[in-house]
């Protein structure tokens, strides 16, 4: 065998061994860091997902965030392996706007959006000129207007994409409601200064509110269910498949039945 051919074969062998070792290392990943937000989201993971992953031999670290911005940047930068706090519309819009290569891997439950008040008990009590605190991020603001339209409080112009509704897209606001956009985490605190607040379920719960205390709760469409997300390059990794499987398990359904009644769920968890 010639010197050149021998070295070529050795090079191919070394590359093959290196690739195999790399794949083995990827498959052997046993530490997972998952980001989420305070309140119900971290509790859902702690009670329903973390135990299943630990039973499979993973060491799981849950990292809590107080906003909807940091978890995706932390995931894209490699500080997290996965996150669970957002619906797929928010994920896609955020990833596109910030040029992040992220992908959803499975749907999960969500504490529904709710209309809350310390002053009033029903939608019928909404008065003219009432001040309503609303989420300031575009996707959840659009979701809020669709929610309020269910009760005839506003109406969007014909042909407007319901996923992109803004205040400028409202054709009707019969009670001349005044909307106060705030960071989602601040909405519970706004209850003392406004007539109503439209609050994402996880932040309502983390602030001590109960879903049963809401003046009204959203009938959550499937596209607003939360998703677990990873970097796109990792979405088919064995550990990502294990995360997805945990969200689809009977164990998880039983946890939701016992500890999280009233949550909107994917069909597989009904």
Segments (PLM) and residue ranges:
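Pocket-flanking alpha-helical
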Residues: 68-99, 114-116, 121, 141-144, ...
């Amino acid at each position: 065998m010639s010197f050149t051919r021998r070295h070529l074969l050795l090079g191919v062998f070394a590359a093959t061994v290196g690739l195999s070792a790399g794949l083995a290392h990827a498959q052997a990943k046993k530490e997972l860091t998952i980001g989420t937000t305070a309140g119900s989201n971290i509790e859902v993971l702690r009670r329903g997902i973390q135990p299943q992953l630990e039973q499979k031999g993973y060491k799981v670290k849950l990292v809590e965030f107080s906003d909807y911005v940091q978890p995706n940047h932390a995931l894209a930068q490699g500080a997290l392996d996965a996150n669970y706090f957002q619906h797929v519309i928010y994920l896609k819009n955020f990833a596109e706007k910030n040029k992040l290569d992220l992908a959803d891997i499975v749907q999960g439950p969500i504490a529904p959006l709710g209309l809350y008040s310390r002053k009033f008990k029903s939608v019928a009590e909404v008065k003219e000129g009432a001040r309503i605190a609303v989420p300031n991020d575009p996707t959840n603001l659009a979701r809020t207007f669709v929610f309020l339209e269910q009760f005839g409080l506003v109406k969007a112009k014909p042909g407007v994409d319901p996923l992109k509704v803004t205040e400028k897209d409202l054709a009707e606001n019969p009670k001349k409601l005044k909307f106060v956009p705030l960071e989602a985490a601040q909405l519970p605190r706004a209850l003392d200064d406004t007539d109503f607040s439209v609050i994402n379920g996880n932040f309502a719960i983390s602030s001590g509110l109960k879903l049963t205390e809401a003046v009204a709760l959203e009938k959550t469409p499937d596209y607003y269910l939360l998703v677990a997300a990873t970097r796109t390059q990792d979405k088919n990794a064995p550990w990502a498949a294990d995360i997805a499987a945990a969200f689809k398990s009977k164990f998880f359904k039983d946890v939701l039945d016992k500890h999280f009644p009233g949550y909107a769920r994917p069909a597989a968890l009904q």
